[in-house]
């Protein structure tokens, strides 16, 4: 299997996926440097973004939600659940309005039918925005 440069770099540096470099770029652009933040990672599988944030900001509290299971990330409180049910997760719901950062690299399963996929992506984006607006401080 061929791997691109970013995937190889991630592997060499011990990250779960190359997606960490997207997050790193975003954090640099917005000059984010809260050393002890409370983070909600929506659609956190395979755990790469959470793993990166725990390493970069070890005093932070991280909460992750995804339909897929992930290998444990030390310091991440993980919940295997649909984002649409996030309000039913007491440990996250009790912190509503107190998160410093909400991140998401969420994507739906694609059907290959463009019209269906576009609607699913749109609906998932709207739900992600709803959650972010509700849970950010």
Which stretches of residues belong to each language-model region?
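Class I SAM-dependent methyltransferase Rossmann-like catalytic core
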Residues: 1-34
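Residue-level signature of catalytic and energy-coupling elements of molecular machines
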Residues: 23, 43, 102
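Conserved SAM-binding motif I beta-strand of class I
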Residues: 61-66
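Mobile active-site "lid"/loop adjacent to the S-adenosyl-L-methionine
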Residues: 97-137
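Conserved class I S-adenosyl-L-methionine
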Residues: 35-45
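Conserved SAM-binding loop of SAM-dependent methyltransferases across substrates and taxa
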Residues: 46-58
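Active-site catalytic pocket residues across diverse enzymes, especially alpha/beta-hydrolases
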Residues: 30, 57, 93-96
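S-adenosyl-L-methionine
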Residues: 67-109
């Amino acid at each position: 299997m061929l791997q691109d440069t970013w995937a190889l770099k991630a592997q060499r540096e011990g990250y779960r996926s190359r997606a960490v470099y997207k997050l790193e770029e975003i954090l640099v652009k917005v000059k984010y440097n809260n050393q002890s933040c409370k983070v909600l990672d929506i659609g956190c599988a395979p755990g790469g973004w959470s793993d990166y944030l725990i390493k970069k900001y070890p005093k932070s509290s991280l909460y992750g939600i995804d339909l897929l299971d992930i290998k444990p990330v030390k310091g991440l409180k993980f919940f295997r659940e649909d984002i649409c049910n996030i309000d039913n997760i007491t440990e996250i719901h009790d912190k509503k309005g107190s998160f410093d950062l909400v991140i998401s690299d969420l994507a739906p399963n694609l059907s290959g039918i463009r019209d269906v996929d576009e609607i699913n992506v749109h609906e998932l984006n709207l739900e992600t925005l709803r959650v972010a607006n509700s849970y950010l401080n």
